[in-house]
From Swiss-Prot:
EC number: 3.6.5.-
Any one annotated GO CC term: cytoplasm
Start-end of Low complexity biased regions: 77-87
MF terms in GO: GTP binding; GTPase activity; magnesium ion binding
Protein name from the UniProt record: GTPase Obg
Amino acid sequence: MTEGNFVDYVKIHVFSGKGGKGSAHLHREKYITKGGPDGGDGGRGGHVILKGSKNLWTLFHLKFKRHVKAEHGGNGSKQRSSGSQGSDEYIDVPLGTVIRDTETNEIIKEITEDGQEFIVAEGGMGGRGNWHFKSSTNQTPRYAQPGVDGQQIDVTLELKVLADVGLVGFPNAGKSTLLSVITAAKPKIANYEFTTLKPNLGIVEYRDFKTFVVADIPGIIEGAAEGKGLGHRFLRHIERNSTLLFLIPSDARDIKKQYDILLDELKRYNPELMDKDRLVAISKSDLLDEELKAEMAKELDKELQLPYIFISSVAQSGLTELKDKLWQMLNREPV
């Protein structure tokens, strides 16, 4: 998937189908001059339905599909024949899609399961045929109901990636490299900021065929909560993660300060993110000798007051312990 193909935000206008008209037909047959009403009902208009698909990872297929329209219901006809029901229009979306009313910005629904369906615009009911209106005082009603108009609504679809662990760090912290060595993912890796322009997902194969999903969230910079850098576009993906893994390089000028800045950005974006489990991974630990690592650990024990681990993606050290800690946190086991 190329960067341009990762689309996590689209606006579309949906129209459900109008209900078909009821028929005002009067029965006509040879030798029967005063046949009664036999007009059939109109068919229901088609719904517009959003459906979750585990085979989609992006909203790219909707990037150029700004209008979605369902079929109108068929009109009723003689002999009480009902009109055909309008075909429903399905819109497949990836799991983790949030549906908002564009006008009010209100969340209407979230699609989180494969096959989950949600009617975003209901088709109009078909009108009733004239036979429904026959009475003792009106044996031949010539009135039939028109079909009910379909619904129209502007909706905004936002994708929030579904993953167990979210990798959080400044640009160029080595998140993509870590993801590539603990999973089979192949993210773009280069030594410049914002290499990652989309969340990359990787599946960690743990012991006894157990697995969990890690998402490499594009680099956060100071001010991201106000929209700087890649801003809100990617911060929302973190909302889905149950555990946050902060990646800070060992050669950072001040590890505690970097952690505090990252945490503050998340807090300002959404205070509820503070309820998530957190683990700090000190990367590039292959640059440290044992004496320096021990000295750094002593400082971190005082300052961080949360679990941390030294790792090296290049030397592939500390990675088994990292997987163990993440698995324990995901399953609420003592770390």
